[in-house]
Regions:
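Active-site mouth loops of central-metabolism enzymes
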Residues: 41-49, 100-113, 139, 165-176
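Glycine-rich, proline-tolerant flexible connector loops at the mouths of alpha/beta enzymes
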Residues: 44-47, 67-77, 85, 131-144, ...
Length: 213
């Protein structure tokens, strides 16, 4: 049903064409404001603490007073153990609590651990869950195993958004990126994202984003 036999060169050429045609007309203040409102303000540091996450959340609480002409960010994204801190500190409406889960960022742990971590994050206040696909399963051709994990975690999330990160730099080709995108959406992903930004060989390129579309 879907053509995943893509040429990297063709994708790059198409992206270059889109950039040339579309960037100038979208380089406007309204578009930039819209994009700002889509941001997940994120802290995923090994040095994060209750105090630092509270301070981080207070910045969002104060945002409307400091920037009354801008809409606030879409969400605050933290590790699952800080979900309750954000929930108890956040005072503004319209900003969700997002948590990474499922053995983030490598996705290398037992499915039972992924399920438990996701359930605990939701119990602590998470509105959205960010996971990474099981890249090892995908690259070894175990598509069923990869999809089953996503389906299990979506069942835990229920009505809450499940955002699935493809880690496109590890997938190497436009064909793999499109295939992983389709499989993730088929398995219940509410959103797909390109990369964690934590892996040294992951370089976000425009043609990788195009392959998601």
């Amino acid at each position: 049903k879907y053509n995943t036999n893509l040429s990297d060169a063709d994708i790059q050429a198409r992206v270059a064409e889109l950039i040339e045609k579309k960037v100038p007309e979208n380089n406007t203040e309204d578009v930039k404001k819209f994009l700002f409102n889509c941001i997940d303000l994120t802290t995923l540091n090994s040095t994060d603490s209750d105090k630092s996450v509270m301070h981080f959340t207070e910045k969002v609480n104060q945002f409307d007073d400091e920037y009354p002409d801008l809409k606030n960010v879409a969400a605050i994204c933290v590790y699952p153990n800080f979900a309750a801190i954000v929930k108890n500190t956040l005072e503004v409406d319209g900003v969700n609590i997002a948590c990474v889960s499922g053995g983030f960022p490598s996705s290398q742990t037992f499915i039972e651990v992924k399920v438990a971590e996701t359930a605990l994050a939701i119990a602590e206040g998470a509105d959205e869950i960010d996971i990474v696909i099981s890249i090892g399963k995908f690259l070894s051709g175990d598509y069923e195993g990869m999809c089953e994990e996503i389906q299990e975690l979506k069942e835990v999330c229920k009505e809450r958004h499940l955002k699935v990160i493809l880690e496109t730099g590890a997938l190497k080709s436009a064909s793999n990126i499109k295939k992983a995108s389709i499989l993730s959406m088929y398995s219940g992903a509410d959103f797909i994202k390109t990369s964690t930004g934590t892996v040294s060989y992951t370089h976000l390129r425009a043609h990788e984003t195009r392959s998601n579309l």
